[in-house]
Amino acid sequence: MIVTRSWLNEWIDISTISTDKLVKTLNSIGLEVDSISSYEVPQKIVFGRVLECKKHPDADKLNICQVDIGVSTRQIVCGASNVRAGLDVVVATIGAVMPDGTIIKPVTLRGIESEGMICSAKEIGLADINSGIIEIDSSIGKYKIGEEVSQNHLFSDDIIEVELTANRGDCLSIRGVARDLSAAFDKPLRERKIQEDEDKRVGIGRILSLSHENNLGVNIRYKAVDFKNLTLPFIVRLRLSQLDDKKESDVESLMLYATHSSGVILRAYDYALFCAKDETMAKISLCRDKNGFASVMTKDKKVSIVGVMQEELFKVAHSNGVVLIEATYIPPDVISKKMQENKIPAGISYYRASRGSEPDLNQGLDYCISVIEDNSESSVYGGTIEIDEPHEDKIISLNKKEIDEIVGANIDKAKITKILKNLGFDTTKSLADNFVIIVPKFRHDIVNKQDIVEEIVRLVGIDNIPSKPFTFTETNSFSSDYYDYKKRVTYRHKAAFSGFFESVHFVFDEKKVLQEYGFEILDESKELLNPIVNTLDTLRSTLLCGLLRATSNNINNGYSSVKLFEVGSVFNSQREESLKMALIFSGDREAESLANTGKPAKVDFALFVQKVSNVIGEFELREYKTKHTLSHPYQCAEIFIKEVSVGEIFRLHPNVEQKYDLDVTYMCELNFNKLPNDLKTAKQSSKYQASFRDLSIVMPQEMAYEKIKNVIDASSTKELVRFYVVDKYSDKSLGENMSLSIRFVLQSFDKTLEEEEITNAMNTILEALKNQLGVGIR
């Protein structure tokens, strides 16, 4: 948003306020100044008046002018096409140093002496406003011939660019910024009202009729002007050039100027286009179009969409004749929602309408009409034709205590009331310390009591609020989400430390492959409607297929040993999500080296089990048949941790290994949510020596070790610390039996165990095995 000091001064008196203070104030009230630039016309450049103008005898494009510069009359040769007698101009006198460094000196042009230069805007350091010299008019205020141009506020000004947030549409105008400054400086906002003498003017109702649908949710107002010899004044041309935005016609430029100044969205229409043939009554209808937008129509043609765009055909391209001036307002939330639903092309007015334009339509119309009447012989039709739909007031209630608690400081009630009043809030219904606040229509961003307090803090100034230490009691900041995240990171790190590389896949898989191997698939009603590709046409119910493909790709790329893992989401037939972890080990058990003479052995079940144990800790394996067909029928087991089933481990079926060009391959899939995540707790250890004893027992080959383990665990031998298998043996002499060697570790917390105590403990275990399972020592 671009503003200038002189333009702001039209709406609020800042003549005694320095630019530095103005900028600091804008920043302090939340209107952040993005940049500031100043310009001042050099010395010895004065106002002049062309007394006489005649053609140069030896040059068609040059004119010889007699120019009054106050102290004397100077002869100046000028080549501008718009120079003429009676014109007030800007003259660079002898000795003036121009912005580009040129020094004005007496010269002779085609035999004619010239003492000075009649200047264009660009030549004195202003923005380029036209192709000729500056034409001075009354719009710049009072001036005297011969007076230094730099003494006029328009020729010595500051241009300030303010960076606005999207919710501050109320400051997308000079008047809007001035309104905030009036509250900050406690100065009144200047209003521009037109005193119409209705009896002397032709009523607009004689030339315009308006019909409309009900409940359109827009406010719209029309004025009619019969333009005669409209010429944009210098001040308008200069300011539009500073905005770097000028329209092709003077009328369109004037609408842009008045909109930027007042904040009201203004449009101009060619009156003749609204009249039927041989009729003088223009007819406008306002209705919703097929997309639900409030649209201006005439003769079944769309003229414009309120707050969005205007058809080029109905724009004004001339400066004479009757023109309809339209002022509109539509709530920003309404127009923004409509535009999100219907992606239609938008004009420049949408930017302002979607952020919140000025709802006081008279402000824009009065400002525009005053510029027209001051700078042309145009006549304005009396009255307006309008649709004025009421918009519900936003009322916010809060009390003094709430304000103080949010701010963290005690602010005087009278000061609060004054700030809110200066900002346009109505507090007349407030009682005692209870504020009942009616939000002004132009403040679309105010929706709750926190917004009200923010307005108070803006005007008080954050630097003027004393700092207070924040007192609080530290609580446990770790949530279940953190522990879930920590668990996932921990297991991923353990897998990486064990030599596995992480593999990451989409949560999609190929339905045909899942069905082929007997995995669960989505119910038909839950399937994907628009798959990315045919090979990713469903949600995965297992991580195994993805790891299998990744391993095959690595083997095909020349790797002889592949170890991968993945932690990710899977879905059951009802699209219910769960988390799983899977690991795969394929090919050589280790890299080629001198130790294995370059011929490493293949991975086996025991090695893979040990690798998985390094990741998830100790576990038991129990006999198990998988529900899918990826598994080898005789090399698969169920994994238990503390009597809880957490997953399965198996060798890949030889047919599947062959299909994917894999060597010996083992896989494991775990229910991640069932994996332990307990904090490690310290256990007391005995200071006395431990004793080791080995027992070799004869047992049937088909007997599960689990039975042996359960009997030993239940033997109630308190000295037994742990036990584990160290060897197994079978030969013909044992027949259908085998020998299993188990090592026992015995230890007491009270003393060093004596031989008799150790023997009694081992006998207790042997007796339990014999009585319950019928097995004994070899």
UniProtKB/Swiss-Prot annotation:
Q: Which GO terms describe its cellular component?
A: phenylalanine-tRNA ligase complex
Q: Bound how, and how many: what does the cofactor note say?
A: Binds 2 magnesium ions per tetramer.
Residue ranges constituting the FDX-ACB domain according to the UniProt record: 686-778
Question: Which segments constitute the B5 domain?
Answer: 391-467
Provide the primary localization.
cytoplasm
- Family matches, as InterPro entries: aa-tRNA-synth_II/BPL/LPL, B3/B4_tRNA-bd, DNA-bd_dom_put_sf, Fdx_antiC-bd, Fdx_antiC-bd_sf, NA-bd_OB-fold, Phe-tRNA-ligase_IIc_bsu, Phe-tRNA-ligase_IIc_bsu_bact
Question: What is an example of a Pfam family matching this protein?
Answer: tRNA_synthFbeta
> What biological-process terms (Gene Ontology) are attached?
phenylalanyl-tRNA aminoacylation
Q: Give EC number(s), comma-separated.
A: 6.1.1.20
Q: Is the keyword Metal-binding in the record? A: yes
Which reaction(s) are listed as its catalytic activity? tRNA(Phe) + L-phenylalanine + ATP = L-phenylalanyl-tRNA(Phe) + AMP + diphosphate + H(+)
* Coiled-coil segments: none
Per the record, the domain of life is Bacteria
Query: Into which EC class is this enzyme placed?
Result: ligase
Tell me which UniProt keywords the record has, alphabetically: Aminoacyl-tRNA synthetase, ATP-binding, Cytoplasm, Ligase, Magnesium, Metal-binding, Nucleotide-binding, Protein biosynthesis, RNA-binding, tRNA-binding
Name the Gene Ontology molecular function terms of this record.
ATP binding; magnesium ion binding; phenylalanine-tRNA ligase activity; tRNA binding
Q: Which annotated residues bind Mg(2+)?
A: D445, D451, E454, E455
Positions of disulphide bridges: none
The Swiss-Prot or TrEMBL record describes its family as follows:
Belongs to the phenylalanyl-tRNA synthetase beta subunit family. Type 1 subfamily.
| Name the record gives this protein | Phenylalanine--tRNA ligase beta subunit
